[in-house]
A protein has these predicted regions:
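C-terminal lobe and pocket-closing loops
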Residues: 118-186
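A ligand-binding cleft/hinge motif common to bilobed small-molecule-binding domains
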Residues: 6-17, 71, 75-82, 109-144
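Alpha-to-beta junction loops
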Residues: 1-4, 59-61, 103-112, 125-128, ...
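Short helix-initiation/N-cap motifs at beta->coil->alpha
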Residues: 89-100, 113-116, 207
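Hinge/capping helix and adjacent helix->loop/strand transition within the periplasmic-binding protein
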Residues: 12-97, 147, 161-193
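Conserved beta-strand segments of alpha/beta enzyme cores
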Residues: 86-88, 127, 200
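Flexible, acidic loop-helix segments that line cofactor/substrate-binding pockets
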Residues: 193-211
Length: 224
């Protein structure tokens, strides 16, 4: 068994090793990282209303984030609010780099996961302005409203964390291990893990795991 995330999948597909999700047996998806949009604590964008006002005024807004899932969910956000021409998306190698650029005033907004940004929110350097999730995050990220609260459709693209096995594993064994991992997610220790690393619960059964991993692969390959 091997821990396997959507980021691992993208790295694998970008490499020259020639492997795809089809070479493995997806077992379970356990949890997910979701994203928020952050602004400087005392910057011009204190809320989504400030972002919308800048768009309505014809301003260009510079946003930083990574090339993978953060860009995917940001594109969904832009499409939902109908403002494709209002943003310049600047690529960074990591969330830490884009957060640093935000604090330095090089960009107006940045994408980021709870784990990557929480320390900077607690220190008062940045603030969350939009939660790209179906519900608000826990404190100290809870001041950011969801898109649904703002009057739009929910926007989210969870970066899943899961488990895979060799492609030769039998169907019976795959079902067994999915059940084992489901039991893990029902323990207090697992809830403590989610809380520690600011992850969202996102357990998927065997069929859903296969579907999600395959679709993530197909979508990523189509975007290249």
């Amino acid at each position: 068994l091997l821990c396997f995330s959507s980021g691992d999948m993208q790295n694998m597909l970008d490499s020259e090793i020639g492997l795809t999700v089809d070479d493995f047996a997806p077992i379970a998806i356990m949890a997910a990282d979701k994203q928020l949009i952050f602004a400087q604590k005392d910057g011009k964008f204190a809320s989504f209303d400030d972002i919308k006002a800048a768009i309505d005024n014809g301003e260009k807004i510079n946003v930083g984030g990574t090339k993978s899932n953060e860009k995917t969910v940001f594109d969904m956000f832009v499409e939902e609010i109908g403002a494709a021409d209002s943003f310049n998306y600047m690529f960074y190698d990591s969330s830490a780099e884009s957060i640093t650029a935000l604090m330095g005033g090089h960009i107006d907004l940045c994408m980021g996961s709870p784990a990557a940004a929480v320390n900077y929110v607690e220190s008062g350097d940045i603030k969350p302005v939009v939660a790209l999730s179906d519900e608000r995050f826990n404190a100290p990220l809870d001041e950011a409203p969801t898109m649904e609260e703002l009057g739009y459709n929910t926007v989210q693209s969870p970066m899943w964390r899961g488990v895979i096995a060799p492609g030769s594993m039998s169907e019976e064994a795959q079902e067994y291990w999915n059940g084992v991992f489901k039991a893990v997610t029902e323990t207090d220790a697992w809830q403590d893990y989610l809380n520690t690393y600011l992850l969202s619960p996102y357990f998927q059964d065997l069929d859903s795991t296969r579907e999600i991993m395959k679709k993530a692969q197909d979508d990523y390959l189509a975007s290249k």
